[in-house]
Amino acid sequence: MKITRWTAEMSPKKEILIQLIQAEGLDYTEVEIRSGLKLTNHRTQMREFIQIIEGELIFNLSGTQFALRPGDKLELPPNTLFSYNNLKSDVCTFLSSKTI
């Protein structure tokens, strides 16, 4: 697992995040997670990337919890068990990409 935190002074723009993903040769899917929604015990089949556009997700990997915020990128290796939930009152939107 690798987390890359967004450190630029400006907030990330969706178009910029898409360009960064495409520069890596990846396709993406845009995902919206409503407030209160939870995904439990999901296992990656391939290498998976998640990059937050807006909102916040709380991830749980092997009992370790951490927050992902706008611009943050999470890289998960194949066969990784994880869960996440949106504890905020706003929708969380992220880009999901997968590769072998």
Where are these regions (language model features)?
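Short acidic-glycine-tyrosine-enriched beta hairpin
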Residues: G63-N79
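Short histidine-centered beta-strand/loop micro-motifs
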Residues: I18-L20, K38-T44, N85-L87
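Short, conserved beta-strand element in jelly-roll/cupin
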Residues: I33, T44-F59
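Structural motif
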Residues: E56-I58, Q65, L81, V91
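A short, N-terminal "cap"/entry segment at the start of jelly-roll beta-barrel domains
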Residues: M1-E30
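Ligand-binding loop in jelly-roll beta-barrel domains
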Residues: N79-I100
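Conserved short histidine dyad/triad with adjacent acidic residue
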Residues: K14, D27-T44, P78
